[in-house]
Curated annotation (Swiss-Prot):
Encoding gene, per UniProt annotation: gab-1
Keyword Cell membrane: yes
Transmembrane as UniProt keyword: yes
Chief localisation class: membrane
Membrane topology summary: Multi-pass membrane protein
GO cellular component: chloride channel complex; GABA-A receptor complex; postsynaptic membrane; synapse
Cytoplasmic side: 345-527
Annotated protein name in UniProt: Gamma-aminobutyric acid receptor subunit beta
Disulfide-bonded cysteines: 180-194
Keywords assigned by UniProt, alphabetized: Cell membrane, Chloride, Chloride channel, Disulfide bond, Glycoprotein, Ion channel, Ion transport, Ligand-gated ion channel, Membrane, Postsynaptic cell membrane, Receptor, Signal, Synapse, Transmembrane, Transmembrane helix, Transport
Region (Disordered): 405-465
Length: 550
């Protein structure tokens, strides 16, 4: 009985415990909901309080704030520290002497007017960039800037952060094109130093002191990739710049850049080498193939000129000589020398052939004016053609024969006039009837080496014609004067040719004549000399410019 009673009591107690537990759980749910509502309500009230506190705090901070005055006005100089984060190197231009850089610029200073009490539960406030218009900010600028702009996607990339102790952090993201004075004497095997120069525009060193935020003054340089360059290092500098308005603090970030020559090897150097080697092909072409060798030489020369023009257009117009100019000029010299080599071969070959054939060119007698040219025609009418052929020749024998012929002609004319008074003349009135024909053509008898014989027979009983004799005398006198002037010109040409011949003989005595028996030897030697000289030039060129300090 006792056991059964004890079991009943145990079961009843267990049942009551379970029922009480269930009721307790059901009773706590409404209590938890009310607690969460109370917490959310408290957070909302607290947030509203903080918003109101922050708004009132900013209003209180700006209540008596004068943005025209720097922090610590009238006291010690304001310490302004800054750091830079490099986002990217966009481009570098040798023509414009500048480079484009995207960076984050952060500036830090302390403004006592922006402090607030520690009792306010706000330790730091991050504000938009527009708030910077309500407080004093440094008048920082980039001294070597050409063109800069702030990014505005999706909002204006400016940031302002204020701490409880009055410390201000002011940051912005900008892209700037900065000038970079380059020394291109070793281009494209050169190294350059490009800088970012930061300076205060209006505040002197007595009002604002600028310092780098060491040890983390510059970030992101190792991850930056520069087109056609390799960043070998960087360092920061600070200096004081004195101008007419005072002394200003300047912070400089110097990038040490070395140009990558791979682009120029494939763009300039390798084509030049191939063109020079192409010019050597003419040494294996027969020297009688004039059109082929000349066309090849001219093509290589024009190609080198085109490459040189393209390189000059990608560089600024500077007065000093660059290393790439030396290489292009030497390649042009090698190509042009290959063309001159064929000129030497051609001259040697055809000069020898002409020497074997003999003969030479005769010098023409140049008339001084129109009157002299007319006198030459008149002389040909009255002087035998064999003698006239000798006038333009440089030999003294023919000139003397011409003079003797003219004197004989004058004597014959006088005899003919004397005989005409007693004997009748023939039909022809010319004093030299056997030598002339109709149409002013010279008789073939004039080619005889003997002097001409004039006829003295005339018709008996015929009366002389005075008018004809008068015209004949006048014509012969004028022709004789012109013939003498013509002979004077012939003597001048003879003396000129003799003088030039004498100079040539003296020059040949002084300068030894190089005679090549086989013109193919010039091509054979050129096949070796040209490549060897070009290889030696390249060894000296690359050894010097790869080792010389830029």
């Amino acid at each position: 009985m006792r056991r059964s009673k004890t079991r009943r009591i145990f079961h009843v107690s267990i049942t009551l415990l379970l029922v009480s537990t269930i009721f307790c759980q059901n009773g706590t749910k409404p209590h938890n909901n009310s607690t969460s509502d109370q917490m959310s309500s408290s957070w909302s009230n607290r947030s509203q309080t903080m918003y109101s506190n922050a708004s009132s705090l900013l209003s209180d901070l700006l209540l008596d704030y004068d943005i025209r005055l720097r922090p610590g006005f009238g006291g010690d100089a304001l310490l302004l520290t800054m750091d830079i984060i490099i986002a990217s190197f966009d481009s570098i231009s040798e023509v414009d002497m500048d480079y484009t850089l995207t960076m984050y610029l952060h500036q830090y200073w302390t403004d006592e007017r922006l402090r607030w009490s520690n009792e306010i539960p706000i330790d730091e406030m991050t504000l938009s960039g527009e708030f910077s218009q309500n407080i004093w900010v440094p008048d920082t600028f980039l001294a070597n800037d050409k063109h800069s702009y702030l990014h505005e996607v999706t909002e204006r990339n400016k940031m302002l952060r204020i701490n409880v102790d009055g410390k201000v952090a002011y940051g912005m993201r900008l892209t700037s094109t900065l000038s970079c004075s380059m020394n291109l004497r070793n281009f494209p095997l050169d190294s350059q130093n490009c800088t970012v120069e930061i300076e205060s525009y209006g505040y002197t060193t007595s009002e604002v002191l600028m310092k780098w935020n060491y040890p983390l003054a510059v970030h992101g340089v190792e991850q930056a990739d520069v087109p056609q360059f390799t960043i070998t290092g960087f360092h920061t500098e600070d200096s004081i710049v004195s101008t007419a308005t005072g002394s200003y603090q300047r912070l400089s970030l110097v990038f040490q850049l070395r140009r990558s020559v791979g682009y120029f090897i494939f763009q300039t150097y390798l084509p030049c080498v191939l063109i020079v080697m192409l010019s050597w092909v003419s040494f294996w072409i027969n020297h009688e193939a004039t059109s082929a060798r000349v066309a090849l030489g001219i093509t290589t020369v024009l190609t080198m000129t085109t490459i040189s023009t393209g390189v000059r257009q990608s560089l600024p117009r500077i007065s000093y000589v660059k290393s790439i100019d030396i290489y292009l000029v030497m390649c042009f010299v090698f190509v042009f020398a290959a063309l001159l080599e064929y000129a030497a071969v051609n001259y040697s070959y055809w000069g020898r052939e002409r020497g074997k054939g003999g003969g030479g060119n005769e010098w023409p007698v140049n008339g001084a004016n129109k009157e002299d040219r007319e006198s030459a025609v008149n002389v040909q009418k009255w002087v035998p053609s064999g003698l006239m052929d000798g006038v333009p020749q440089p030999q003294d024998r023919r000139v003397e024969a011409l003079e003797e012929a003219m004197s004989t002609s004058n004597t014959a004319a006088q005899n003919n006039n004397f005989e005409s008074t007693s004997k009748p003349k023939k039909r022809s009135s010319s004093p030299i009837p056997p030598l002339c024909r109709a149409g002013n053509t010279i008789s073939e008898e004039s080619e005889s080496p003997d002097y001409p014989r004039y006829s003295t027979t005339s018709l008996k009983g015929a009366r002389p014609h005075a008018s004809l004799n008068h015209k004949t005398h006048h014509l012969k006198g004028r022709s004789s004067a012109r013939a003498k002037r013509r002979m004077t010109l012939a003597r001048m040409n003879v003396s000129m040719k003799q003088s030039i011949s004498g100079i040539g003989r003296r020059a040949r005595k002084v300068i030894p004549t190089i005679r090549v028996r086989d013109v193919n030897l010039i091509d054979k030697y050129s096949r070796v000399v040209f490549p060897v000289c070009f290889i030696v030039f390249n060894l000296f060129y690359w050894s010097y410019y790869m080792m010389v300090p830029s």
